[in-house]
């Protein structure tokens, strides 16, 4: 067992809760101790939902372990049905209750409820949250989608949209953008699931001609099942960035039998022109490290390199089930992917890569802050500030605009650097002190890594080093000292500084 202060994913029953909370008319009866009710806060606090997720906990306590905990579950399930009258119910156990081996599936079946009861077998000690969401959605689709039915020939084929859940990164806004794209193409949407769907809606999934998978982490297994049983092909292109959105539009248009040209001719994204118009000194070649779930990490890496001209120096994911996709993308950039859910390993990799920008999760925001590196959150897990009240998608052409702002705004642009150069030697405003209205206390700059042997810097070289922007000054210092040490130079001069810069720029 590994003790940690942070985890990228919760146990699999949290994934099941994300699916249940996204749907209507579905209730989740969870065999869990009293302490596991903390999960409600993920939805009411982080996502700021105005209602609790549709979950009934058995909430057994220590004193109940000497009695019949199975009876507790049966009573909770019966009361949940009587109170909420759902169209369907899912039942399962949390990681703690799994140890009791009470068999929630068999207990619920014995109750003989007049609705579908779908048991969930979520091995909490082998799997995690995203897998739990995928397995839950797959089980629901398998149980409720109904037998395959003949579909009439149509001039324009319809689709289902699969994947968006509660507590997903910008899922609500992404769905709005994708629906607008499909509307502009004239493609009818049959069902959106899990978000906003009911069990009755899942029974209509087979009426569509194909499926659109927005988030493979959640919907790939269900889409593969529908492809096998209902002969529904699926499109699995995450439309994140201008290029991916164009590819998505062409793919769904081909499946539906419509012309994508009108939509592509009027895409309305400002990212391509903005990326070309920004001074390349402050955009092109910026070193970026990307980490997150597979869908968002791979997409962010492609946008950063192909559309903004950044240099990718690190790519990784915490989602082991999708490690192959991330490794393939990393290899395309000449990198080795980091596949780990240990935030300390991620911090070590970021520090070693010395990026100028980090794109990651809420944890990478903390890591980057400690290292003094700009950061933008592009993937779950996220915190409350990453669930904005405004419309802020990542998908579609408007999502590309949002993504441009997200990736570029943390960077220091030309005017800001020019102002720093103007006031570098000012006793009140130079970058070695905090803002004057905060009392002028010294800035806690990230210290350079300790070196085995002390090196002497000439006064002129130190003065020249201060002209380097503070957020890459540590990197410039360490590279120069490494250059001097490798050549046994006793004194670092201005010439040494520029020789080192030329050496490491090759």
Curated annotation (Swiss-Prot):
Record-listed [4Fe-4S] cluster binding positions: 36
The protein's assembly and partners: Protochlorophyllide reductase is composed of three subunits; BchL, BchN and BchB. Forms a heterotetramer of two BchB and two BchN subunits.
Cofactor note: Binds 1 [4Fe-4S] cluster per heterodimer. The cluster is bound at the heterodimer interface by residues from both subunits.
InterPro entries for the chain: ChlB/BchB/BchZ (IPR050152), LI-POR_suB-like_C (IPR013580), Nase/OxRdtase_comp1 (IPR000510), P-CP_red_C (IPR042298), Protochl_reductB (IPR005969), Protochlorophyllide_Rdtase (IPR016209)
Annotated keywords: 4Fe-4S, ATP-binding, Bacteriochlorophyll biosynthesis, Chlorophyll biosynthesis, Iron, Iron-sulfur, Metal-binding, Nucleotide-binding, Oxidoreductase, Photosynthesis
Gene3D superfamilies, per the entry: 1.20.89.20, Nitrogenase molybdenum iron protein domain, Proto-chlorophyllide reductase 57 kD subunit B
Pfam families: Oxidored_nitro, PCP_red
GO terms, biological process: light-independent bacteriochlorophyll biosynthetic process; photosynthesis, dark reaction
Gene Ontology MF term list: 4 iron, 4 sulfur cluster binding; ATP binding; metal ion binding; oxidoreductase activity, acting on iron-sulfur proteins as donors; oxidoreductase activity, acting on the CH-CH group of donors, iron-sulfur protein as acceptor
Residues that bind substrate: 414-415
Organism superkingdom: Bacteria
Cofactor(s) of this protein: [4Fe-4S] cluster
Keyword flag ATP-binding: yes
Coiled coil: none
Gene responsible for this protein: bchB
SUPFAM superfamilies xref list: Helical backbone' metal receptor (SSF53807)
Function statement: Component of the dark-operative protochlorophyllide reductase (DPOR) that uses Mg-ATP and reduced ferredoxin to reduce ring D of protochlorophyllide (Pchlide) to form chlorophyllide a (Chlide). This reaction is light-independent. The NB-protein (BchN-BchB) is the catalytic component of the complex.
Catalytic center residues: 279 (proton donor)
EC number per UniProt: 1.3.7.7
Pathway in which this enzyme or protein is active: Porphyrin-containing compound metabolism; bacteriochlorophyll biosynthesis (light-independent)
Family in the record: Belongs to the ChlB/BchB/BchZ family.
Catalysed transformations (reactions): chlorophyllide a + oxidized 2[4Fe-4S]-[ferredoxin] + 2 ADP + 2 phosphate = protochlorophyllide a + reduced 2[4Fe-4S]-[ferredoxin] + 2 ATP + 2 H2O
Name of the protein this chain belongs to: Light-independent protochlorophyllide reductase subunit B
